[in-house]
Amino acid sequence: MQPNDYIEANRSMWNETADVHAQGYVSQLLERIKDPDFRTFDDVEKRIFAHMGLDGKAVIQLCCNNGRELISVKKAGAGRCVGIDVSDKFIAQGRHLASLGGVDVELLRSSVYDIPPDLFGQFDLVYITIGALGWLPDLEAFFGIVSRLLRTNGQVFIYEMHPILNMFDANKGLTVEASYFQREPFVVAEGTDYYDPAQVIKSVSYWFPHKLSDVIGGCLKHGLSLTHFEEYAHDLSMVYAAFENLGKKPPLSYSLVARKIA
């Protein structure tokens, strides 16, 4: 398969997932989003955003899903806010949520590899959250795009599941099921929804087990200098939550901030 074939397959999966979320999870958001104090941030995000400052900054979120996190960023004082996602239906959900919340954000349906060039060099912050990087077939090209989106001295903030978790099946505990160095994508023929595990997602999708060095190396290769990195014992994915209770456990998530130096 070619990279675009993977992207289109994953797009179909996300559109199916959006339909599932519209039946339950999104209805819960519809009321919450109207609250001026609505935020999705946990303590890690609060601390990092407080340190870097959001006031008036131009922010773009890649793989933004339905935009709820971007809406939070806007409500926290950011300036121009743009969200990119491959799913038509999640972008439509996001526009509806933003309208209900009275929030001015721009949500664009696009693969991250096909972002309009007129967005390059326009942002102070690229924001990437849980469940984004594993759906991308070419991480090096992705970080090249991240760099082009940023102004000089702009920052990228990544808050993601730790890639070591790709070695484990969440239902089998800490039994190693895959090599950390696997390059072939995992094929998900029938997955379950992360908000409602009773719902089966039938579309075939592809998850790429990138190494942590792929993330850090991608930043460094494209002129993004690390200013912060930390690993955590809490799960962001809702898949490995049971691992939090293990006495001996691997890292479950991490945060990374890097600055464009040229």
Residue ranges, per PLM feature:
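A short glycine-rich, Lys/Arg-flanked "PGG" loop and its adjoining helix->strand segment in the class I
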Residues: E140-Q155
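Conserved alpha-helix/loop element of class I SAM-dependent methyltransferases that forms part
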Residues: S27-K57
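A short acidic, Gly/Pro-enriched loop at the edge of an enzyme's catalytic core
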Residues: P117-L125
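N-terminal, positively charged/glycine-rich alpha-helical extensions of SAM-dependent methyltransferases
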Residues: M1-L29
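Short alpha-helix
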Residues: Y195, Y206-E230
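A short SAM/SAH-binding and catalytic strip from SAM-dependent methyltransferases
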Residues: D124-E140
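Conserved class I S-adenosyl-L-methionine
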Residues: Q155-D193
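Class I SAM-dependent methyltransferase SAM/SAH-binding core
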Residues: A58-I115
